[in-house]
Regions:
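Rossmann-like S-adenosyl-L-methionine
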Residues: 1-124
Length: 124
């Protein structure tokens, strides 16, 4: 399941799924991620793993609370802003997750911009 507010991103995702022979096993929704997560939590959907790549401002508290209530075993959080990622990781850790790994990726050489990737696991 892929959720993206930008409809053009959904078109690209569907094209990539088709190119990789995954069109029948992938679903994509053009919707605000917080809105989607709140609906998923209300419907008590099952999510085993969650990948998050929010805008520079980070995730909303409502999104994070919904993620915690859905209780995926693993959350991968990709960020272009280490400060907001740190804030959001603290929220997730207070909700029962522990930080398993944190990596820095220099995708923009010779600039001050970096991507960080955090992997969290739900505590048993």
């Amino acid at each position: 399941m892929g959720v993206e507010r930008n409809a053009a991103g959904i078109i690209d995702a569907k094209a990539n799924a088709e190119l990789n022979g995954l069109a029948n096993s992938c679903e994509f929704v053009a919707k605000d991620a917080t809105e989607f997560m709140l609906e998923a939590a209300r419907e008590e959907r099952r999510i085993d793993a969650l990948s998050i790549d929010p805008p520079r401002a980070g995730s909303t508290p409502e999104f994070l609370d919904a993620a915690i209530s859905l209780a995926p075993r693993r959350i991968t959080y990709i960020s272009c802003n280490p400060q907001t990622q740190c804030r959001d990781l603290q929220h997730l850790m207070q909700g029962g997750y522990h930080l398993e790994r944190l990596s820095l990726v220099d995708m923009f050489p010779h600039t001050t911009h970096v991507e960080t990737v955090a992997v969290l696991r739900r505590e048993q």
